UniProtKB/Swiss-Prot annotation:
It is found in: Secreted. Keywords: Antimicrobial, Disulfide bond, Fungicide, Plant defense, Secreted, Signal. The keyword Glycoprotein does not apply. The lineage of its organism: Eukaryota, Viridiplantae, Streptophyta, Embryophyta, Tracheophyta. GO terms for cellular component: extracellular region; secretory vesicle. GO terms for biological process: defense response to fungus; killing of cells of another organism. Residues 1-29 form the signal peptide. This is Defensin-like protein 205. Belongs to the DEFL family.
Length: 86
């Protein structure tokens, strides 16, 4: 009886651990939808970028300072703040 109970508890614990570990990477990986671009002062800082993203796009989950391909878009070296959401 005790071995059966221990086996059931171990199996249940293993399943719970599996469900939790499978959910964590998917929650972090879903922040990849481009929402738009916001203006920040040069030089672009991640903290300022994330604050501006949250202000303009309340459902944003991250903001990143990124370089554009300046041959096509601009003549000067410039970083832009891109906002991403789920």
């Amino acid at each position: 009886m005790a071995k059966t109970l221990n086996s059931i508890c171990f199996t249940t614990l293993l399943l719970v651990l599996l469900f939790i570990s499978a959910e964590i990477p998917t929650a972090e990986a879903n922040c990849d939808t481009y929402l738009g671009e916001v203006t920040v002062y040069y030089p672009c800082r991640e903290r300022d970028c994330e604050a501006q993203c949250y202000e303009h796009y309340p459902h944003s989950c991250k903001g990143e300072c990124e370089h554009h391909d300046h041959v096509v878009h601009h003549d000067n070296e410039e970083e832009h703040c891109h906002c991403y959401g789920r």
